[in-house]
Amino acid sequence: MSKRRNERATIGDHLVYAVYRSASFLLSLLPVAWIFRGGQAVGFLGYVLLLPYRRLARRNVQIAFPDWAPAQVERCVRTHFQNLVANLLCGFVLGERPWKEVKRFIDFTTVGETAEETADARCIVAAVTHVGNWELLSTLPHWMDRPEFGVVYQKQRNRLLDEHVRKSRSRDGMEAIDRSEGLTRGVGILKRGGLLAMLVDQHAGDKGVWVPLFGRLASTSSLPAILAKRAHARLLAGGMETIGPAKWRIEYRYLNLGESASVEEVTSELNRRVEAQIKRNPPDWFWLHNRWKMPSPRFLLRTYKRGVYLPSTSEPLQPFRILIRSSNWLGDAVMSVEAVRRIKRGRPDAQVTMLVRSKLAEFWRTVPEVDDVIGIENGENAWQVARKIRTRFEVAILFPNSPRTGLEVWLARIPRRVGYRRPWRNFFLNQFIPEPKDLGPISHHHAQIYLQIARHIGADMEEALPAIPRIAAEPRTVGLCPGAEYGP
């Protein structure tokens, strides 16, 4: 038993639990259709008041459906807020009711086909999406024929609520397995021919494999694929889709890629199934989760354990747009070229744009890893520069140390702003680079300042870079002065 469940419940736990139980009791007195409609009204209120969550949902919908008009995006977000609360409230109520009442609200049209696909399965791994009323996942033992059932879940901070969730699911024959305790019990269920379910469509952090979801790389849990391969389990993917007020349909399909398919291939295919399910009813998915979360500090992906997997049939990736503010002097710009090249090669979807003084624009266009160059004309102030780059980039990386460079990207509202801590500009940045350690008896070479940035954000510093093509065919003699007033 975990340490958490050995702890005593606090007064706050008791108060929250009392409110939850009271609300559940009052809702249980109402018809489920009324609860659904009332939940939609509460959800609309949340849409109006919860501006940060509305922005997050809007951003996610725009990533998934970049061709949608703004009005279509907003309609999807509004409907999502409404149906999300409606489904959650109905899930609370139906979770307390007997199966003979609950099944009146479920469409079983596809269950027969699912049963045929899994009849001879040794065991089953069910990859569940946050679609519709996912709380009805606990009903699996009532319509699937397996000796045991388990679900991997994240424990509640409130000890009393956590115990209530466990008891409610066990009442239906579903064992709740806290994922922080490991998967020994889940593996045991599979070994005994059971079914193990888990939610699969959330950001998996550093432990996930980066595969496309709607054409944009997303960290995705490979756990369902790993368990299915090791246990020789049949893999199902799906959820409980909303098809009307207080009405849901079971949609689970067999994922058959063959025994030879790799973990990465299976994980990628799971994301494709998630896409297909979302496209059937876009407002039904959980858009309030930061599914395409940018990792920190290593938002370049070359050094992650599981790395990136791109299926051979995948569409072109949506670009991960990186703005790099170049130094203003030619010598400094030359010394930063290697860092720019390594940053570009840090992830397959990287699109690098250099923000430079106009006098350096032609120089940066000769670097093959640079996709675009934006020039800063003489006399342009920070507000004018910010207008040029506003809403166009996910990341801004600052090579110069001046406060103005921080102000430019802050005014442009670029989400991630990266650079060294320097006087008068720390307020404008939200990711800081540690100073490089001195190399040997003298101070580090100035190029190391830029390479340290690339290293800290996840670039591969060991990769051999291809040679840059010659700019001109005729031989020339170039003289370099390897020094500066402030260092080598």
What is each PLM-predicted segment?
Residues 2-128, 133, 162-167, 173, ...:
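Membrane-anchoring hydrophobic helices of lipid-metabolizing enzymes
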Residues 148, 175, 195, 232-234, ...:
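Residue-level detector of anion-binding/catalytic polar loops
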Residues 85-108, 150-180, 354-383:
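Membrane-interfacial amphipathic helices and adjacent loop/beta segments
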Residues 122-180, 203-209, 216, 361:
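Catalytic core of membrane glycerolipid acyltransferases/transacylases, capturing the structured
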Residues 2-4, 8-11, 75-78, 118-119, ...:
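Non-catalytic C-terminal accessory region of glycerolipid acyltransferases
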Residues 122-128, 149, 194-198, 233, ...:
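Generic beta-sheet signal
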Residues 51-54, 71, 85-87, 116, ...:
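Catalytic machinery of carbohydrate-active enzymes
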Residues 108, 176, 211-213, 292, ...:
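Short clusters of hydrophobic/aromatic residues that line enzyme substrate/ligand-binding pockets
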